[in-house]
Amino acid sequence: MEPAEQPRTSPAVRAHHARARLGASLFFFLNGFLISGLLTRLPEVKGLLALTEVEFGFIIAALPVGSIAAAALPAPLIRRFGAAAVASAGTAVLALVFTAAAAVAALGPGAEAGRSPGPAGPAAWSPAIPWIVAALIALAGFLDAVVDAAQNVHGLIVEQARGTSIFNSLHAIWSVGSVTGGGLGLLASTLRIPLWAHLSVSGAIGVGLALWAWRLSGPNPFASDRTGPAPRKRTVIPDEDDSGETTDATGTTDATGTSAEPGRSAADARPAAGTTGAEETGTPDGTSVGDTAGGEAARPASSASGPDRSAAPSKWALLAGVIALGLLGAFVEDLGMNWSSLYFSEVGGVGVQFAGIAFVVALTGQLIARFTADRLTDRIGRPGVVLSGGVCVTIGMLLAMGVAQPWAVVVGFFLSGYGSATFIPTAYAAAGMIPGLGHGMGITLASWALRIAMLSSSPLIGLTAGALGLRYALVITVVAGLGAIVLAFTPVLRNVDTGRR
């Protein structure tokens, strides 16, 4: 006998969604936590390995190089094993790789000077050790790219199953994890806890929480892009909206109360016994949630469901626009994270002891926006959120550049951090909802492009500052804000918007 159908508002379904959201949140938290734990103690790595500045630069570069090398690998992994499984396994291995890197670094010649000796002591020194550390850091970058794509896919799956936005707050939780990991790293360094001991504890925490996050998500959670040897049926969580119509997890509606997929009844949409109650398997071609095996989004035949798909932009045009939005966000965030303190000091005219205020207010604005943007997304939709963010960035950077007084710089960078906070999460979410592209492929390509952008943004800002002066280098972020405003009026976001349910 099939289990009784449960509406999305039932206590069992709400509890399931709460567990899944907690699992997704843990993935994002751990990703920020693990990486920042190492980054805060990189100077000790330099000392342990007795590196020159040039050699240290190559060690640091290994992380982004490894992440870019991952290229499109996350997509097939997600389709084969499921997003939650890939995120969990990748996070656990990432934690172990960081631990291994710290243990190997502790064998360096710097330990002879009393710098955090490892369990094997300095006698185990070999000229190959710096190369091994660089290889491990490159592997960490590779794994981070895989985990980044998988956790974003899983977060989007949970969001679509819930029917309400959570994507911005998930990215805010990544920031909380980063601050937590960095704070613990700073505390460990202050207490002179050896690097290998610190990262061993962090690694154990990472492995344990990654496995727990997977258990919270279930072995094949929600609408993962996992595929088997043959296409399998898509199951849908029914949802009663205010009109009494039933809406599936992707937002498509049928007035008869059945799922929007032709030939499917409400009984077909019920989960099979033993499933999570919200599981959806993909198709062999990796089409996204709501897509049929042929690649077209599942929709009612009625024209009331939206414009004709043939009139919509191609999936590649949509992907290009989504990536463009992410690139704009990367440039604005890079300015706030890496250049705000210098700008406040040199252009705002404050002492170096107060220069960090600009960084703090930019980060504060970003966190506030990400924790509050989900509710706003549900109300006005993703295009409206991006539009308002673009306006904030444009006004804030014009204020900081035009007035260039301390108060104006502080207000300007707060508005910039607040406004740009939703650009990258929105780009990830939109990339995962492009019809005809699987979650894994869309988000993987967007993530890969963003990593390249983050490598190039600071040099471009530096070149602009060298040509025009640091004050007028902010013109790049003004252009980014205007670009976001333009994108908000294009089909790029309207075609994949899930707000205003």
List the predicted regions and their residue ranges:
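C-terminal transmembrane helical hairpin of 12-TM major facilitator-type secondary transporters
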Residues: 380-427
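Helix-loop-helix hairpin linking two adjacent transmembrane segments in secondary transporters
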Residues: 173-221
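Helix-to-loop junctions at the C-terminal end of transmembrane segments
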Residues: 69-83, 189, 369-381, 465-466
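C-terminal ends and interior cores of transmembrane alpha-helices
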Residues: 92-126, 392-404
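Short amphipathic helix-loop junctions that connect adjacent transmembrane helices
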Residues: 40-54, 338-354
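Primarily marks hydrophobic transmembrane alpha-helices of the MFS/SLC 12-helix fold
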Residues: 84-87, 91, 386
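Intracellular juxtamembrane helix-capping segments at the cytosolic ends
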Residues: 146-161, 422-435
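A late C-terminal transmembrane helix in Major Facilitator Superfamily
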Residues: 437-470, 477
